[in-house]
């Protein structure tokens, strides 16, 4: 079952950075790199979601996967399609499977602080919150008040704020496509 899945050994510390990455951008890379350095992780796995259950639609998977590969630099950053390979749509399913597939590996879930607003909408969010340590990396527009509802045992990493967002990138792309071409 581990064939074509990322390599990890007992004792390793792996950050799990899941997302739609629609598209991936420098802000995503900043979150992953901050967690890698500040948490002393051996690797960060970018888990490209087949389809975010909280979003109506996403760009094609291959396009999003490639955009993540273009942002994840260095040998310690691993972009993977393991959720698609395993057929999972929800984080709790992924965490259950990874704990069985990789005994002795210490996983930490990484997310930008902007994801806190929707965390309680995740399927089995309580299970996710208790399954592994969760590291929250600061993001623009998310102040300390947003963190108040999050469990105290989570790890909060304040870092330089990176203003780019996938939503803004998609909006600019749509606007550029909608502009009439001059002859």
Predicted regions and their residues:
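Nucleotidyltransferase catalytic core that binds NTPs
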Residues: 1-183
